[in-house]
């Protein structure tokens, strides 16, 4: 059986996105040079990985202040709305992972973070002392960690790249975040593979390990598998309920019949038994059919 890492679709990107060697002093000099030349940020910069340099350029274009100390916080009403969605399938799929990691990270000077597709933190677990330190820079529920809000960081850069990524210490764009190391990986919707969240391992720079990005990717993949199982069970129960009400008409009738789950995805189209070779039918199964704002 393949491991989560073997199955992860971006498994070939680990070495590209994880630093082989890291010299914080050299990276700090590269950052200072970059900030001093903000009007010409595309100039080549030595001493920093390309993936980080490109993120600095994006952060600069977004108007992020280099001296920013903390991430902005989402307004309570907006956070409450996001939490309502999180209480459904996403929460069920992540709880085992978060519970297990909470115990593992106790005393390990690290924390695990779950965000939504916009980089808004929904839940944090881990070492209490680290959680308290994180709250000082809004590395806490409600903090907004997209690149456009907080510059180069594990969560925001993983969101932008749609790949697992490591951002260590001086590689962060904002001064207030340079004491931290973050390894993050995107969580994908099992139906359409869009990003629905980020799982992120964070701590002060002493937790730096090259394999942390791969570890985050494995956690993300485990959550995706749990989401897929939950979605399959939900779709099966819906199909079972519909067939149970009028089994003969559902399976053998000539009328058009489509079954759409509560996320607006087509899970059954009776026309497929007559025109199974039609790509428009097979391609539609499991894909968004209605324009719903929710996603799984």
Indicate residue ranges for each PLM-predicted region:
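Terminal output helix/cap of sensory domains in signal transduction proteins
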Residues: 155-156, 277-296
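PAS-family sensory/regulatory modules and their coupling/dimerization elements
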Residues: 171, 180-185, 287-296
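PAS/PAS-like sensory domain cap-loop motif
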Residues: 130, 134, 268, 272-285
